[in-house]
Regions:
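C-terminal helical "tail/cap" subdomain of flavin- and related membrane-associated enzymes
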Residues: 1, 21, 78, 292, ...
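Conserved N-terminal helical subregion
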Residues: 1-3, 20, 47-172, 176-189, ...
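Residues at the starts of beta-strands that form the adenosine-phosphate
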Residues: 2, 25, 226-228
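Conserved mid-domain beta->alpha element of the FAD-binding
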Residues: 6-33, 158-159, 186, 213, ...
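Conserved N-terminal glycine-rich FAD pyrophosphate-binding loop of Rossmann-like flavoproteins
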Residues: 33-51
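Acidic/histidine metal-binding catalytic segments
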Residues: 64, 120, 262-279, 337-342, ...
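Flavin-dependent oxidoreductases
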Residues: 184-216, 245
Length: 412
């Protein structure tokens, strides 16, 4: 059996490792001219780290990332709404990692090249067309100037090519642009003095704007960390996104400044942190409505191509990794490739659709919104505003939906 993987992001590369581990041949085609370590920080949750541990990547990730120790939810005045340990410190058998997105992709890319060979990943290859027949699927690839560069044939084709997936567009030709909720997201990372434990994550704000801050790598000195931050705030009424959503549009600091003025985070000088950041990026916060199906014949979708979701709850990359494991297992177990794709879809589509809808409601960060709605001017006693059991239901309920509650995660 052979799989054609369209997209060399985290989901596509992990899929290649999963398939190789199970003895299934595969090729990865990426439209960018090179797989560069771009982006800013992300969190990778224990259920996904357990899968990467099974692939033998834990030591490499540990060297590149921060083991997240704790998470705080604060209101816009910096008052504590919720606090919980994370990863190993919460009793999981594997860590939660905060890491630079590009570094995570780089670790996985290096493993693919080492195990499958340099020819397993072809860059500068845009999918032009694919066609299925009774015996397999054929795909044609072109460079950015439109010249044909490759034709390949396999038993299945996996679209892991992101929110602007060309594979998804071929399967669902009249879907239209992604859904924008009217929120803009600004992100950046810079070296900064360590705060709290040096492994802490803070989410603060209210209904109109929120900010997240956490370290993603060691700094030049023990008391400094490469620190990731993100601010999300309303910029419109929603609908079609104002510009193409990607990770490479420079942010405008003057648009961010009024929103930052709303925050008071006791442990971090937010304005100074952002001012010290050499480059910042912005994009409209978008997702897509869940599809009724991902697979048609020998072709299926994975990761953001299948279920793009708002970046709350630290779930985007983690869910792509879970997709990869499920798809690889299905291809091994099923008697026919199409049966495998249907089994994969039946397992993963309902779960990810639920997360997409949960993220639209704010995900676990909805606990901040719930408290602000009840106490917009702050509080003297959080339990008098929203009892512990109700706050726990919001946060833990999301963990259950997303599959990373402690009892759900089984480490290798």
């Amino acid at each position: 059996m052979k799989a054609i993987i369209v997209g060399g992001g985290i989901g596509g590369l992990v899929t290649a490792l999963m398939l190789h581990e199970r003895g299934i041949a595969c090729e990865v085609y990426e439209q960018a001219d090179a797989i560069r370590e771009l982006g800013v920080g992300i969190n990778t949750l224990p259920h996904a780290i357990a899968e990467l541990k099974r692939l033998g990547l834990l030591e490499r990730l540990d060297a590149a990332a921060i083991r997240t120790y704790e998470l705080f939810y604060l209101n816009r005045f910096g008052q504590e709404i919720w606090r919980e340990p994370r990863g190993l410190d919460a009793g999981y058998e594997v860590p939660q990692f905060s890491i630079h997105r590009g570094r995570l992709q780089g670790v996985i890319r290096d493993a693919v090249i080492e195990r499958l060979g340099a020819d397993a990943v072809r860059t500068g290859c845009r999918l032009g067309d694919f066609r299925q027949d009774e015996g397999g699927v054929t795909a044609w690839f072109f460079d950015r100037l439109g010249s044909h560069v490759a034709t390949t044939r396999g038993d299945v084709l996996v679209g892991a090519d992101g929110i602007h997936s060309s594979v998804r567009a071929a399967l669902v030709p009249n879907e239209g642009p992604p859904c924008w909720n009217g929120l803009m997201l600004w992100r950046g990372a810079t070296e900064w003095p360590a705060f709290l434990t040096g492994r802490s994550m803070i989410v603060a704000g209210g209904l109109s704007a929120k900010m997240v801050v956490y370290p993603i790598a060691e700094g030049s000195r023990p008391d400094r960390k490469l620190t990731n931050w993100a601010v999300v705030a309303r910029a419109g009424e929603g609908g079609a996104p104002p510009e193409k959503e990607d990770w490479s549009r420079p942010g405008r600091r003057e648009e961010l400044t009024p929103h930052v003025a709303r925050f008071a985070i006791p442990h971090v000088d937010v304005e100074a942190l952002i001012a010290a950041t050499p480059e910042l990026w912005e994009y409209p916060m978008c997702d897509r409505d869940p599809l009724p199906r991902w697979s048609q014949g020998r072709v299926t979708l994975l990761g953001d191509a299948a279920h793009p979701m708002y970046p709350v709850g630290s779930n985007g990359a983690s869910q792509a990794i879970l997709d990869a494991r499920c798809l690889a297992d299905a291809l091994v177990r099923a008697e026919h490739p199409m049966a495998a794709l249907h089994a994969y879809e039946a397992e993963r589509l309902p779960k990810t659709a639920e997360i997409v809808h949960a993220n639209r409601k704010g995900g676990p960060e909805g606990v901040i919104d719930a408290v602000e709605a009840l106490a917009p001017d702050g509080f003297a006693d959080i339990d008098a505003v929203l009892p512990h059991a109700e706050r726990e239901a919001i946060v833990r309920g999301y963990a259950q939906k997303a599959g990373f509650a402690k009892e759900q995660v089984k480490a290798a």
